[in-house]
Protein backbone atom coordinates (compact mmCIF):
# COMPACT_ATOMS: atom_id res chain seq x y z
CA UNK A 1 0.00 0.00 0.00
CA UNK A 2 1.37 3.40 -0.97
CA UNK A 3 0.30 4.84 2.35
CA UNK A 4 2.78 2.51 4.02
CA UNK A 5 5.68 3.89 2.00
CA UNK A 6 4.91 7.54 2.43
CA UNK A 7 3.26 7.83 -0.99
CA UNK A 8 -0.46 8.37 -1.42
CA UNK A 9 -2.31 8.32 -4.73
CA UNK A 10 -4.80 11.14 -5.10
CA UNK A 11 -6.48 10.74 -8.46
CA UNK A 12 -3.62 11.01 -10.94
CA UNK A 13 -1.37 13.12 -8.75
CA UNK A 14 1.04 11.71 -6.22
CA UNK A 15 1.29 13.18 -2.76
CA UNK A 16 4.49 12.46 -0.84
CA UNK A 17 4.66 12.45 2.95
CA UNK A 18 7.93 14.35 3.29
CA UNK A 19 9.11 17.17 5.58
CA UNK A 20 7.68 20.56 4.51
CA UNK A 21 10.90 22.33 3.53
CA UNK A 22 11.95 19.41 1.33
CA UNK A 23 8.46 19.24 -0.17
CA UNK A 24 8.77 22.91 -1.13
CA UNK A 25 12.10 22.37 -2.89
CA UNK A 26 11.19 19.06 -4.54
CA UNK A 27 7.48 19.48 -5.32
CA UNK A 28 8.17 19.78 -9.05
CA UNK A 29 9.58 16.25 -9.02
CA UNK A 30 6.31 14.74 -7.80
CA UNK A 31 4.48 15.64 -11.02
CA UNK A 32 7.14 14.39 -13.43
CA UNK A 33 6.44 11.21 -15.41
CA UNK A 34 9.39 9.35 -13.87
CA UNK A 35 7.94 9.87 -10.38
CA UNK A 36 4.59 8.31 -11.28
CA UNK A 37 6.45 5.33 -12.74
CA UNK A 38 8.72 5.16 -9.67
CA UNK A 39 5.69 5.22 -7.37
CA UNK A 40 4.06 2.37 -9.25
CA UNK A 41 7.27 0.30 -9.32
CA UNK A 42 7.94 0.78 -5.61
CA UNK A 43 4.33 -0.06 -4.75
CA UNK A 44 4.57 -3.29 -6.76
CA UNK A 45 7.89 -4.20 -5.15
CA UNK A 46 6.56 -3.70 -1.62
CA UNK A 47 3.37 -5.57 -2.49
CA UNK A 48 5.12 -8.58 -4.05
CA UNK A 49 8.48 -8.81 -2.24
CA UNK A 50 10.03 -8.12 1.12
CA UNK A 51 11.63 -4.68 0.80
CA UNK A 52 13.52 -2.29 3.03
CA UNK A 53 13.41 0.06 4.79
CA UNK A 54 9.96 -0.30 6.32
CA UNK A 55 7.62 1.84 4.23
CA UNK A 56 7.11 4.55 6.80
CA UNK A 57 10.90 5.15 6.87
CA UNK A 58 11.54 5.55 3.13
CA UNK A 59 11.81 9.35 3.43
CA UNK A 60 13.39 9.29 6.90
CA UNK A 61 16.56 11.10 5.77
CA UNK A 62 14.47 14.06 4.60
CA UNK A 63 12.08 14.00 7.54
CA UNK A 64 14.82 14.07 10.19
CA UNK A 65 17.02 16.67 8.48
CA UNK A 66 15.07 19.65 7.08
CA UNK A 67 16.42 21.38 3.97
CA UNK A 68 17.51 24.58 5.72
CA UNK A 69 19.38 22.69 8.43
CA UNK A 70 21.57 20.52 6.19
CA UNK A 71 25.25 21.09 6.97
CA UNK A 72 26.70 17.80 5.73
CA UNK A 73 25.52 15.25 3.16
CA UNK A 74 26.78 11.68 3.48
CA UNK A 75 25.79 9.86 0.32
CA UNK A 76 25.34 6.11 0.20
CA UNK A 77 24.30 3.83 -2.63
CA UNK A 78 21.22 1.99 -1.36
CA UNK A 79 19.73 0.78 1.94
CA UNK A 80 21.07 -2.22 3.82
CA UNK A 81 19.25 -5.23 2.46
CA UNK A 82 19.03 -7.56 5.46
CA UNK A 83 16.16 -7.80 7.94
CA UNK A 84 16.11 -5.13 10.64
CA UNK A 85 19.01 -3.04 9.29
CA UNK A 86 17.61 -0.33 7.00
CA UNK A 87 16.06 2.69 8.68
CA UNK A 88 15.94 5.25 5.87
CA UNK A 89 19.29 6.83 6.79
CA UNK A 90 22.41 5.89 4.82
CA UNK A 91 24.90 3.82 6.84
CA UNK A 92 22.66 3.84 9.95
CA UNK A 93 21.20 0.78 11.67
CA UNK A 94 18.74 0.66 14.57
CA UNK A 95 19.93 0.39 18.16
CA UNK A 96 20.93 -3.20 18.99
CA UNK A 97 21.79 -4.22 15.41
CA UNK A 98 25.37 -5.32 14.74
CA UNK A 99 27.45 -2.64 13.01
CA UNK A 100 27.73 -3.32 9.26
CA UNK A 101 31.27 -3.19 7.77
CA UNK A 102 30.62 0.14 6.01
CA UNK A 103 29.62 1.82 9.28
CA UNK A 104 32.53 0.19 11.10
CA UNK A 105 34.83 1.80 8.52
CA UNK A 106 33.23 5.21 9.08
CA UNK A 107 33.66 4.84 12.82
CA UNK A 108 37.30 3.77 12.37
CA UNK A 109 37.98 6.92 10.33
CA UNK A 110 36.41 9.06 13.05
CA UNK A 111 38.47 7.24 15.67
CA UNK A 112 41.65 7.71 13.64
CA UNK A 113 41.05 11.40 12.88
CA UNK A 114 39.50 12.55 16.14
CA UNK A 115 40.68 9.92 18.67
CA UNK A 116 37.05 9.22 19.54
CA UNK A 117 36.06 5.73 20.72
CA UNK A 118 33.97 3.62 18.35
CA UNK A 119 30.32 3.79 19.48
CA UNK A 120 28.49 0.58 20.26
CA UNK A 121 25.34 1.81 18.49
CA UNK A 122 24.98 2.25 14.76
CA UNK A 123 21.89 4.45 15.05
CA UNK A 124 22.82 7.76 13.40
CA UNK A 125 19.49 9.49 14.06
CA UNK A 126 21.27 12.01 16.28
CA UNK A 127 23.54 12.97 13.37
CA UNK A 128 20.50 13.51 11.13
CA UNK A 129 18.86 15.76 13.71
CA UNK A 130 22.09 17.80 13.90
CA UNK A 131 22.13 18.56 10.16
CA UNK A 132 23.71 15.50 8.56
CA UNK A 133 21.63 14.36 5.59
CA UNK A 134 22.22 10.60 5.50
CA UNK A 135 21.01 10.05 1.96
CA UNK A 136 21.07 6.94 -0.17
CA UNK A 137 20.93 7.50 -3.93
CA UNK A 138 18.33 4.73 -4.07
CA UNK A 139 15.84 4.85 -1.20
CA UNK A 140 14.52 1.27 -1.26
CA UNK A 141 15.88 -2.23 -1.84
CA UNK A 142 14.54 -5.77 -2.13
CA UNK A 143 15.54 -8.05 0.73
CA UNK A 144 18.90 -9.80 0.30
CA UNK A 145 19.61 -8.22 -3.12
CA UNK A 146 21.91 -5.19 -3.06
CA UNK A 147 21.18 -2.57 -5.75
CA UNK A 148 17.92 -4.32 -6.68
CA UNK A 149 15.98 -1.02 -6.94
CA UNK A 150 18.77 0.95 -8.59
CA UNK A 151 16.92 1.14 -11.91
CA UNK A 152 13.48 2.10 -10.53
CA UNK A 153 14.07 5.85 -10.80
CA UNK A 154 15.07 6.85 -7.29
CA UNK A 155 18.27 8.45 -8.55
CA UNK A 156 16.29 11.03 -10.52
CA UNK A 157 14.68 12.05 -7.25
CA UNK A 158 17.78 11.98 -5.05
CA UNK A 159 19.82 13.78 -7.73
CA UNK A 160 17.15 16.50 -7.66
CA UNK A 161 17.58 16.75 -3.88
CA UNK A 162 21.35 17.17 -4.27
CA UNK A 163 20.83 19.72 -7.05
CA UNK A 164 18.39 21.69 -4.87
CA UNK A 165 20.93 21.84 -2.04
CA UNK A 166 23.63 22.82 -4.52
CA UNK A 167 21.53 25.65 -5.98
CA UNK A 168 19.86 27.06 -2.86
CA UNK A 169 22.38 26.53 -0.08
CA UNK A 170 26.08 27.26 0.45
CA UNK A 171 29.00 25.72 2.32
CA UNK A 172 27.57 22.23 2.65
CA UNK A 173 30.12 19.46 3.12
CA UNK A 174 29.40 16.61 0.69
CA UNK A 175 30.98 13.29 1.69
CA UNK A 176 31.02 11.07 -1.37
CA UNK A 177 32.45 7.78 -0.16
CA UNK A 178 33.04 5.09 -2.76
CA UNK A 179 33.06 5.10 -6.54
CA UNK A 180 29.30 5.25 -6.88
CA UNK A 181 28.96 8.25 -4.58
CA UNK A 182 31.84 10.03 -6.29
CA UNK A 183 29.92 9.82 -9.57
CA UNK A 184 27.52 12.39 -8.05
CA UNK A 185 30.31 14.99 -7.84
CA UNK A 186 29.04 16.38 -11.16
CA UNK A 187 25.93 17.66 -9.32
CA UNK A 188 27.90 19.80 -6.87
CA UNK A 189 29.48 23.22 -7.44
CA UNK A 190 32.86 23.00 -5.68
CA UNK A 191 33.02 26.80 -5.52
CA UNK A 192 29.96 26.86 -3.23
CA UNK A 193 30.42 23.62 -1.30
CA UNK A 194 33.12 21.34 0.13
Name each region found by the language model:
Residues 192-194:
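Short, flexible loop segments at boundaries between secondary-structure elements
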Residues 15-25:
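Generic N-terminal amphipathic, Lys/Arg-enriched alpha-helix
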Residues 16, 28-176, 180-189:
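A polyanion-binding, active-site-adjacent surface
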Amino acid sequence: DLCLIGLNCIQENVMVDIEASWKQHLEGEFTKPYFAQLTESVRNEYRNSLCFPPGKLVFNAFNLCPFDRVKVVILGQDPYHEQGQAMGLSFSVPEGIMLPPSLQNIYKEIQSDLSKPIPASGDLTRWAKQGVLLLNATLTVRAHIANSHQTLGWQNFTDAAIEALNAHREHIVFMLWGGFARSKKRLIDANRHC
